[in-house]
Amino acid sequence: MAERFSSRLADVIRRPLITEKATRALEMNQYTFEVDPRAAKPDIKAAVEHLFDVKVIGVSTMNPPRRTRRVGRFAGRRSQVKKAVVRLAEGNSIQLFPES
């Protein structure tokens, strides 16, 4: 695991991504998260296993292109994001939606 995240695994995962595609992937025991752009796959795996107490069998990552945003005549770019799709072992799950 990379040195930069060894003491603070909670900083690797920023938030879960809830989209139509990510919701469909939940049926196949795959969860989608927005993660720190500097995080490597072993960092993401260790963070998910530590935070949610589950067994991870695979991690896929993607770096979508940054998007340009305008405010009046000034153009800027949104911050870099990295998405990770985490596959869990059979019988494991993460409670994303609280029971009410």
Curated annotation (Swiss-Prot):
Keyword flag Ribonucleoprotein: yes
PROSITE patterns according to UniProt: RIBOSOMAL_L23 (PS00050)
Residue ranges of the TM segments: none
Highest taxon above the source species: Bacteria
Keyword set includes rRNA-binding: yes
Gene3D superfamilies membership: 3.30.70.330
Keywords, alphabetical: Ribonucleoprotein, Ribosomal protein, RNA-binding, rRNA-binding
GO biological process per UniProt: translation
Listed GO CC annotations: ribonucleoprotein complex; ribosome
Pfam families, sorted: Ribosomal_L23
Record-linked SUPFAM superfamilies: Ribosomal proteins S24e, L23 and L15e (SSF54189)
GO MF term set: rRNA binding; structural constituent of ribosome
InterPro entries (alphabetical): Nucleotide-bd_a/b_plait_sf, Ribosomal_uL23-like, Ribosomal_uL23/eL15/eS24_sf, Ribosomal_uL23_CS
Function summary: One of the early assembly proteins it binds 23S rRNA. One of the proteins that surrounds the polypeptide exit tunnel on the outside of the ribosome. Forms the main docking site for trigger factor binding to the ribosome.
PANTHER family linked to this entry: 60S RIBOSOMAL PROTEIN L23A (PTHR11620)
NCBIfam families cross-referenced by the UniProt entry: PRK05738.1-3 (NF004359), PRK05738.2-4 (NF004363), PRK05738.3-1 (NF004365), PRK05738.3-2 (NF004366), PRK05738.3-4 (NF004368)
Family that this chain belongs to: Belongs to the universal ribosomal protein uL23 family.
Complex and partners: Part of the 50S ribosomal subunit. Contacts protein L29, and trigger factor when it is bound to the ribosome.
Protein name: Large ribosomal subunit protein uL23
Biological source species: Synechococcus sp. (strain RCC307)
Name of the coding gene: rplW
